[in-house]
Amino acid sequence: MSRLIFFILVTAIYFVGNEACKEIEIVIKNTLGPSRILQYHCRSGNTNVGVQYLNFKGTRIIKFKDDGTERSRWNCLFRQGINMKFFTEVEAYRPDLKHPLCGKRYELSARMDAIYFKMDERPPQPLNKWRS
């Protein structure tokens, strides 16, 4: 009987803990300038959003749940300019293996000088400069 109670308690804790975690959002914004197109390619483990294009002032959101493993790591390759000559690679999300980050919003904004990163209410910070 005590084993049954222990099993039910462990099962309840597992399901309640996992259900409370909200999705994490990676927001990608194109603020390069009028008539400038941003190309991005984001991937994580077996998830691959493919090559996507974003017009000026466009916004895309990638939503996912952190499973607490390295498979939750998201990397994005950005390209812009004539013939997509300028590029940079960004680690958009790195999981905290001890404490999953639930409901966070990570914003990546493409500007002419660099990709800027913003989290929560903090001001945007330059993350990676464009390379050619």
From Swiss-Prot:
Pfam families (alphabetical): Self-incomp_S1
Cellular localisation: Secreted
One Gene Ontology term, aspect cellular component: extracellular region
Residue intervals passing through the bilayer: none
InterPro entries reported for this sequence: Self-incomp_S1 (IPR010264)
Single GO BP term: rejection of self pollen
Protein's UniProt keywords contain Secreted: yes
Highest rank taxon of the organism: Eukaryota
Signal peptide from the UniProt entry: 1-20
Key words of the record: Secreted, Self-incompatibility, Signal
Family: Belongs to the plant self-incompatibility (S1) protein family.
Protein's UniProt name: S-protein homolog 15
Organism: Arabidopsis thaliana (Mouse-ear cress)
The gene coding this protein: SPH15
